[in-house]
């Protein structure tokens, strides 16, 4: 039995009685977006429970509040599917599609899920902007861009919060992941994440793609 299913069988007391999604999670947001936000993996009692990426946990609240303040979401909260949240010009995805033990997917899991991330990127404009949340998501984005034929910088870029790379027709921006480990310690603050997202929106506008003005949930 997979971890996503085991987590659903023995949830914390506050979630007992809920029906868990407990399946791979798709991306969420504006399918005509010019910004692709890439996290690591669904949380066992967040997205794995609610059926929507970055939904139902503190990491999601932190992310979507920043997206709301950057003009990419219509509300600051992400509680459950059907809560009215809509994204404008942004699609939120993840490097791994199933909740992993300890929030740490194995390399093989990341390799297996890369095709889904590549497919999502292929549906977006040729100059779509990528925002990687954390080092593993950053690495996944680099591998996907290489897979699509983009020439990789040499030496290979290393993750750093606030980094902005030009790879092929894309801009790749990096941010610390909005995990509680980072947000509770102040390693990542709301202004820090908001600054990265605002920069992503500016980069998207440079492409001349009007998708950042459209809203879709």
Predicted segments, located by residue:
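N-terminal basic, low-structured, amphipathic or hydrophobic segments
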Residues: 210-212
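A cross-taxon signal for low-complexity, glycine/charged-rich
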Residues: 216-217
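A polyanion-binding, active-site-adjacent surface
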Residues: 1-159, 163-205
